Amino acid sequence: MTKLDFKAVLKQHHTVRLHQTAQDWKQAIQLCIHPLIAAKLVQPAYFDDILKSVAQYGPYFIIAENVAMPHAQNNGTVQQNCFSLVTLKEPVYFDNDPRPVRLLIGLAATSAAIHTTEALPQIAALVEDTQVVKDLLDCCDETSLFAVIDRVNLHKYLT
């Protein structure tokens, strides 16, 4: 089994924020990354790294309908492999991209290997079902959120 467990990380580090309000996509990313900074899992510069990546590549981390996974390469700013999860009351839109985003799953990985072999497979399993995404967006508290996550086999794509 993986050493990086999506649900366990969210619970252990208290990195879930539900029904947040963001004026724009930058504030949405800030809401998503701030819990990781507050828990000292990433340095504040990690947020800047994500903004630089968006400026260079566009919103490459919109991965499903209503879902973005803000992350960037570790440039020495990631202290520990971690996740955050934020839902928004209203969608945000990235510049020149018509896709709405209401669920943000923050990811910070210490290495590319962790990113591709442990983190991404769990997130893919979580968001591949649009009903699960809808149910996550409807959650009013962490108990209901974790109950939705428990319905998903997060390890099905792990090798």
Swiss-Prot record:
Domain (PTS EIIA type-2): residue spans on this chain: 9-152
The membrane-spanning stretches of this chain are none
Domain of life of the organism in this record? Bacteria
Q: Where in the cell is it found?
A: Cytoplasm
Q: Name one GO molecular function term.
A: kinase activity
Active site, renumbered = H71
- Disulfide-bonded cysteines: none
Residue numbers carrying Phosphohistidine: H71
Which Pfam family, just one, is annotated for this protein? PTS_EIIA_2
Keyword entries, A-Z: Cytoplasm, Kinase, Phosphoprotein, Phosphotransferase system, Transferase, Transport
Question: Which GO cellular component terms are attached?
Answer: cytoplasm
Tell me the PROSITE patterns matching this sequence. PTS_EIIA_TYPE_2 (PS51094), PTS_EIIA_TYPE_2_HIS (PS00372)
- Which Gene3D superfamilies has this protein been placed in? Mannitol-specific EII, Chain A
UniProt function note: The phosphoenolpyruvate-dependent sugar phosphotransferase system (sugar PTS), a major carbohydrate active transport system, catalyzes the phosphorylation of incoming sugar substrates concomitantly with their translocation across the cell membrane. The enzyme II UlaABC PTS system is involved in ascorbate transport.
> What name does this protein carry?
Ascorbate-specific PTS system EIIA component
Organism, by scientific name, is Mycoplasma pneumoniae (strain ATCC 29342 / M129 / Subtype 1) (Mycoplasmoides pneumoniae)
Q: State which gene encodes it.
A: ulaC
